[in-house]
From Swiss-Prot:
Protein name: Hereditary hemochromatosis protein homolog
Localization (cell): Cell membrane
Keyword Membrane: yes
Protein function: Binds to transferrin receptor (TFR) and reduces its affinity for iron-loaded transferrin.
Gene that this polypeptide is encoded by: HFE
Subunit structure: Binds TFR through the extracellular domain in a pH-dependent manner.
Residues the record marks as carrying a glycan: N110, N130, N234
GO molecular function, one term: transferrin receptor binding
Pfam families in UniProt: C1-set, MHC_I
Source organism of this protein record: Dicerorhinus sumatrensis
Length: 348
């Protein structure tokens, strides 16, 4: 895959990180995704930003328009508010910072401006106990590159070629302190404001409909646990064997996907030994549930009836065949008895 094909793919990967499988139930998050391309062709922007609250898109910004555009009904009336203007100014500042960082990284790699991309994800999460966690990560040409550590005010290099930029940025302590102030103070405050605006929309909770289905293919028995029609999309699904968690490596999971009606769906599957299906339980946690929900595979009544009918027919066929065989044997025995009393006449 060439450099031009990577940006869209990596951006999709970033979007998947927004999915709440990585965010605990009953927490809230504010995330910004930035992407830029060194060449303005093939539909790739120099800088584009998308903002998400609890995984719901609420704002978009690009280098050409240089303004924040609302992407959710619950923020439409805030275009002229002081906080929205501050948000717009922040995005303009990030626009400039992003481009400067982009050129710095390319220079440190001795790269020309042809066919390179930069991606950033930054934001914060607020847990149910009001504790917070901030994050600020860079990706270059589709690979993890640098991550800011607010506790130590330094940068962690995800690859060796990022070391030069890491050392250069760590000299700038003013920027590091500004980054930490945003992650630990400004971001949680902005998130609280947005949650207030979205009250009644963002705080709605629709519990999932959970069912377990049974599949047999190529001599492999699989149980699939489906969670349907839930909101918000942060959900935790796991398999239990004899009430103990199964290693996640043994299970196949599906990303949380929109259902098309404002709700979400997901599933997790597990291959099990035939005949041991009842030992496995699917456990689901979701903000709409007061406690974890469990579900097991229940053989359907129709399957039971079909099995019973087939078994009954098989028994009847066997009895019928035994009866026919019995009659044939009796006839043979009768024929042998008649032949025993018959004597051939002598020739005269």
């Amino acid at each position: 895959m060439g450099p031009r094909a990577r940006p869209a793919l990596f951006f999709l990967i970033l979007l998947r990180t927004v999915a709440a499988q990585g965010r605990p139930p009953r927490s809230h998050s504010l995330r910004y995704l930035f992407m830029g391309a060194s060449e303005r062709d093939h539909g790739l922007p120099l800088f584009e930003a998308l903002g998400y609250v609890d995984d719901e898109l609420f704002v978009a910004y690009n280098h050409e328009s240089r303004r924040a555009e609302s992407r959710a009904q619950w923020v439409l009336g805030e275009a002229h508010s002081q906080l929205w203007l501050q948000l717009s100014q922040s995005l303009k500042g990030w626009d400039h910072m992003f481009i400067v960082d982009f050129w710095t990284i390319m220079d440190n790699h001795n790269h020309s401006k042809e066919s390179h991309t930069l991606q950033v994800i930054l934001g914060c999460e607020v847990q149910e106990d009001n504790s917070t966690r901030g994050f600020w990560k860079y990706g270059y040409d589709g690979q993890d590159h640098l991550e800011f550590c607010p506790e130590t005010l330094d940068w962690r290099a995800a690859e060796s070629r990022a070391l030069t930029t890491k050392l250069e940025w760590e000299v700038n302590k003013i920027r590091a302190k500004q980054n930490r102030a945003y992650l630990e103070r400004d971001c949680p405050e902005q998130l609280q404001w947005l949650l207030e605006l979205g009250r009644g929309v963002l705080d709605q909770q629709v519990p999932p409909l959970v069912k377990v289905t049974h599949h047999v293919a190529s001599a492999v028995t699989t149980l699939r646990c489906q969670a349907l029609n839930f909101y918000p999309q942060n959900i935790t699904m796991r398999w239990l064997k004899d009430r103990k968690p199964v290693d996640v490596k043994d299970a196949e999971s599906k990303d949380v996907l929109p259902s098309g009606d404002g709700t979400y769906q997901s599933w997790v599957a597990l291959a099990v030994p035939p005949g041991e299906e009842q030992r496995y339980t699917c456990q689901v946690e979701h903000p709409g549930l007061d406690q974890p929900l469990t579900a097991t595979w229940e053989p359907s009544l129709s399957n039971t009836l079909v099995t019973g009918v087939i078994s009954g027919i098989a028994v009847c066929v066997i009895i019928f065949l035994i009866g026919i065989l019995f009659r044939i044997l009796r006839k043979r025995q009768a024929s042998r008895g008649a032949m025993g009393d018959y004597v051939l006449a002598e020739c005269e």
